[in-house]
């Protein structure tokens, strides 16, 4: 296991990606763009945490953690849109937001 894979923030981001994958697979036809955008943002969070952890300088690490934090906010906004459009249930929405709040809090401490 690589060092970034042991980070709590990485594990939480992976958990959100799993939830996102399940959620987007259950969307009705015609919402491919919304699903793709959410998946891309969730994957970007995971990738930027990993890349930030692998950088040698604090400035380089911080740059990637900031990107991951911004992508986390995009994921939350995407969940809000899905909720507004009644495309996600309350339980999945609440769990997703809970995971994202944890990711944001941890990334903020890492900056």
Regions found by a protein language model. Name each.
Residues 1-111:
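Amphipathic alpha-helical assembly/interaction segments
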